[in-house]
Curated annotation (Swiss-Prot):
Main location: cytoplasm
GO MF, one example: rRNA (adenine-N6,N6-)-dimethyltransferase activity
Subcellular location: Cytoplasm
Enzyme class: transferase
Gene3D superfamilies recorded: Vaccinia Virus protein VP39 (3.40.50.150)
Keywords assigned by UniProt, alphabetized: Cytoplasm, Methyltransferase, S-adenosyl-L-methionine, Transferase, tRNA processing
Highest rank taxon of the organism: Bacteria
Source organism: Shewanella baltica (strain OS155 / ATCC BAA-1091)
Protein name: tRNA1(Val) (adenine(37)-N6)-methyltransferase
Cellular component terms (Gene Ontology): cytoplasm
């Protein structure tokens, strides 16, 4: 399926995961303004990378394991206004971290990671890979962030609320810490079902975790004003 945003176009037909609200919110919410280098782990169609390219002047490196998704991602990059600042690497993040030429620090890392650690695999293999942590465990993801993140850099993720206990369990023994979390509420009156997270090295000066909420829709089904402000630079409707 194809999606047209204000400044770029996405074709995600050969990608395991289609363009969705999770990635759009993460791409609009991540604090990218000062970043000169950005790493997108599990780039898929390239949506997060393209949103980052629109929002800041950074050079963006996008790592995608699946070959079909990587081809779609490269196509989307080539047709964007920022092709000269977007670099695609078709490999696992583990292989990426081991390549000497890529052992550099990134000011910001962004990722909408696989989130089903257990359960029945999806029938479509690409979708299964995109949705299950079999292809990228939390531990492997945090190890990659630790290796690639600049000393004062941040990493932005979006996770299901039920994954937070596991994340915190791993962080307790990790050189990374959770410095910010924004609870994402689908509609007024509901409990949060997603969490936007910011990770940093434990040497980061900020210690206490900053906590906030974002509600996506009013009871009427319309986007809240907070959500509109977040996405207005991307959605044609606004």
């Amino acid at each position: 399926m194809a999606f047209t945003f204000k400044q770029f176009h996405i074709d995600d037909m050969n990608c395991g995961m289609a363009v969705g609200t999770d990635s759009v919110v993460l791409g609009a919410w991540a604090q990218l303004t000062a970043a000169k280098t950005v790493l997108d782990i599990g780039a898929g169609s390239g949506l997060l990378s393209l949103m980052a390219a629109q929002r800041c002047q950074a050079h963006i490196t996008s790592v995608e394991l699946d070959t079909s998704a990587a081809e779609a991602c490269q196509h989307n990059f080539h047709n964007s206004p920022w092709a000269n600042r977007l670099t695609l690497v078709n490999s696992s993040i583990q292989e990426f971290c081991q390549q000497i030429e890529y052992q550099e620090y990134f000011d910001h890392i962004i990722c909408n990671p696989p989130y089903f650690e257990q359960g029945t695999q999806a029938i479509q293999s690409q979708r299964a890979m995109a949705r299950h942590t079999d292809s990228l465990s939390f531990t492997a993801l945090l190890d990659a962030i630790h290796v690639c993140l600049a000393p004062q850099g941040n990493a932005s993720l979006i996770l299901p609320m039920q994954s937070m206990a596991r994340l915190n369990e791993i962080l307790a023994h990790s050189p990374l810490s959770l410095i910010e979390m924004t609870n994402l509420i689908s509609i007024v009156g509901k409990s949060a079902n997603r969490v936007l997270c910011v990770l940093a090295h434990k040497t980061h000066p900020q210690i206490a975790t900053k906590i906030s909420d974002i509600t996506i829709r009013e009871l009427s089904g319309q986007y809240t004003q907070t959500m509109v402000q977040l996405i207005r630079d991307f959605y044609l409707k606004y």
